Amino acid sequence: MDVLIVGSIAYDSVSSPAGAVTHALGGSATYGGLASSFHTNRLGLGTVGLVGVVGTDFTDEDRAVLTSNGADASGIETAEGETFRWEGAYHGAMAEAETKATHLNVFEHFQPNVPEHAQEPKVTLCANLHPALQASVLDQTKASRLTMLDSMNLWITIAREELLEVMKRVDLLIINDGEVRMLADDENLVRAAQAVKTMAKVATLVVKRGEHGVLAFHGDEIIALPAFPTSNVCDPTGCGDTFAGTLAAYLALGEGPIERDELRAALVASTVSASFTLESFGVAALQTMSEEAFDARIDEFESILR
C-alpha cells in the first residue's frame, strides 16, 4: 500500500452564493482518498487505503464512490447509528465556512483500527481528527517514507498540548495560515510559521492560504505558490483535504529524503487538484476530473508561474 489516509466520512449540507446541496458525500477521508487514488493511478503507484467510520445509513452508492478510483475501503467500519453530518454556509468571498450544525453521530466514538495489511504504507496521512486519534494511527503504523498530519483551529483550542505532541511525531505538517498564527501567537506569517516548525520539530511545514496559495517551509528553504486562478468558485469544502491527499500521492512517488524540487512539483499538483474541487459542490468535480483536464491545468499553471 502506498498511501494510508485516516479521517472522517460525512454527509455535508452546504450553501454558498453559487447555490446549495444537502446530504452530499464529504469528509476528510473522502476528499483526500478520491484525490490521492486519482493520482496514484496517474503515477502508476499502488493502492490508497482508507480508514474511517460510517453509519448504517451510508449508501452502497456512496461506498462505490469511495472505491471508484481503486481505493481499499476495508478499513472503513460500519457502526450502528447515523453517519457524521455537517451543515455549513459560505458568504461573500467564501474565505471561511460558517458552521450551522455538527452532528458527530457514529464519529463521536470512532477509534481508528488500521487493518494489518495497511500498517506499513509508504505514506501515512492523518487527516483532520482529534490529536489523540492521530496518535493512535501513528502507534499502529510504520510509514516507510513519510508521515503527514493535518489539523484545525478546534484542536488548537481544546487539545493544544496533545496536538503539539503528535506534531512532533510526523515528518510533514499541514495547517492553514490562521492556525499557524494561532499556534505561534504571532500575526507575522513567516515568523509564526518558523516558530511552529521549531515547536513541532517537523521537517516540513505546509501552510495553506486559501485564495492566496501556499507557503512551504522545508528545511531552511521556503516555497511560495499562488492559488490557481479560477472564476468558477462554488464550494471550498474539501479543498484542503483534496490538497493533502494529492500531496500524499506525489510524495509516495519518490524514495529517501524529500528534495525541494520534488516538494514543489507536489505542491503544484495539489494546488491544481484543489482548484477542481472548488468548482463544484461536494465531490462531483473529483469524480469527473480527467487526466487530460488535470494535465492541461497543470500546463496552464506552470505557464503562469514562469
Describe the residue ranges of each PLM region.
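Active-site metal-binding loops of divalent metal-dependent hydrolases
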Residues: S8-I9, S28, T242
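Conserved phosphate-binding/catalytic region of the ribokinase-like
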Residues: V190-R306
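Conserved beta-alpha-beta core of the PfkB/ribokinase-like small-molecule kinase fold
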Residues: V123-A195, G213
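Short, conserved phosphate/pyrophosphate- and ester-handling motifs at nucleotide-, phospho-/glycolipid
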Residues: S36, N176, G240
